[in-house]
């Protein structure tokens, strides 16, 4: 069949009915199934290990691999490698990014604020959970404030609801630091409020152990905000190996040195990350229509493309 069923997320309730139905259908009526993979039980830093969910989730992944006519859309090269290690037999493609609409984000702000007019603010937009290493961020803040030769900076946490964590130690420490004037917590932000803050922020900072291609990096890059992420996991691929916007994991010294530069001027590569992720949906459609075979990664030479800049 030329029909295609696409699942935006492989971990979708109801997907377990597919193999039961397809297996009973004649071959000529079987659609091709495309599953986009956003997370994996093999990831040692994923929250599924915190909550003990990995035992059943790895079995669920095996089921997905056995669905007739299934094709896997991985979001980066490292995720592909994990699937190959696990001996997945389904065709695997690297779509190299999350689904993202740059124009939709730009429509939510009236005008991009010039960099030099922005508040000297460093934002943190990941979950405040232990796998995002909020302790590393708070350590960096304390070291920054302790060095009196460094400029005054507002360090901020951006939250869509109240600040919460899978480890309350991080919430307690953050609130104590806010009381001391070391950081500011922005809570219960609507999407447009968050974008307005990004549009008045100079650097978005990330130090996550568990993160693949985060939409926060595309949003900040779209709205004229510098981004500083660890050279870890999929971020070298996302950043096209741009060493000026990535720091050595987990060097606080290197992060602070890069942060000083990114607070002072916009990156010359600003906008390129979001331009690339803006094309992710097109790459998926190319794959599903048979013209994206350059993204296939289940052959012998699948690791040859890891170090190549994607744009």
Residue spans for each PLM region:
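Active-site proximal beta-strand in glycosyltransferases
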Residues: 4-9, 23-47, 73, 95
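Membrane-proximal helix-turn-helix segments that form the acceptor-binding/catalytic region
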Residues: 50-72
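Aromatic "clamp/platform" in nucleotide-sugar-dependent glycosyltransferases that forms part
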Residues: 208-210
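Short hydrophobic beta-strand element within catalytic cores of glycosyltransferases
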Residues: 226-229
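Glycosyltransferase donor-sugar binding loop
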Residues: 153-171, 187
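Conserved donor-binding/catalytic core segment of Leloir-type glycosyltransferases
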Residues: 111-143, 156
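A charged, aromatic-enriched C-terminal amphipathic alpha-helix characteristic of glycosyltransferases
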Residues: 250-253, 257, 261-311
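Donor nucleotide-sugar binding/catalytic pocket of nucleotide-sugar-dependent glycosyltransferases
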Residues: 67-111
């Amino acid at each position: 069949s030329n029909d295609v069923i696409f699942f935006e997320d492989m971990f979708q309730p109801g997907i377990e009915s597919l193999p039961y139905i397809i297996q009973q259908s004649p071959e000529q009526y079987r659609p091709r199934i495309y599953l986009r993979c956003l997370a994996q039980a093999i990831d040692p830093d994923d929250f599924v290990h915190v909550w003990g969910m990995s035992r059943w989730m790895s079995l669920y992944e095996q089921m997905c691999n056995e669905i007739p006519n299934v094709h896997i859309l991985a979001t980066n090269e490292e995720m592909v490698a994990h699937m190959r290690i696990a001996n997945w037999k389904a065709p695997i493609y690297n779509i190299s990014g999350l689904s993202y609409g740059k124009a939709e984000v730009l429509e939510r702000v009236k005008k991009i604020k010039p960099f030099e007019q922005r508040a000297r603010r460093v934002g943190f937009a990941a979950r405040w959970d232990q796998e995002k290493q909020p302790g590393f961020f708070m350590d960096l803040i304390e070291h920054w404030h302790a060095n009196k030769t460094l400029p005054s900076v507002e360090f901020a946490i951006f939250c869509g609801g109240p600040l919460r964590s899978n480890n309350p130690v991080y919430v307690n420490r953050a609130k104590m630091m806010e009381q001391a004037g070391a950081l500011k917590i922005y809570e219960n932000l609507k999407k447009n409020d968050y974008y307005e803050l990004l549009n008045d922020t100079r650097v978005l900072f990330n130090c996550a152990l568990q993160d693949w291609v985060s939409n926060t990096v595309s949003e900040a890059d779209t709205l004229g905000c510098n981004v500083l992420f660890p050279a870890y996991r999929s971020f070298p691929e996302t950043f096209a190996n741009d060493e000026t916007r990535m720091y050595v994991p987990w060097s606080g010294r290197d992060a602070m040195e890069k942060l000083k530069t990114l607070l002072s001027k916009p990156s010359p590569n600003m906008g390129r990350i979001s331009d690339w992720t803006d094309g992710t949906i097109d790459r998926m459609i190319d794959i599903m229509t048979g013209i994206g075979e350059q993204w296939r990664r289940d052959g012998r030479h699948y690791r040859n493309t890891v170090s190549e800049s994607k744009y």
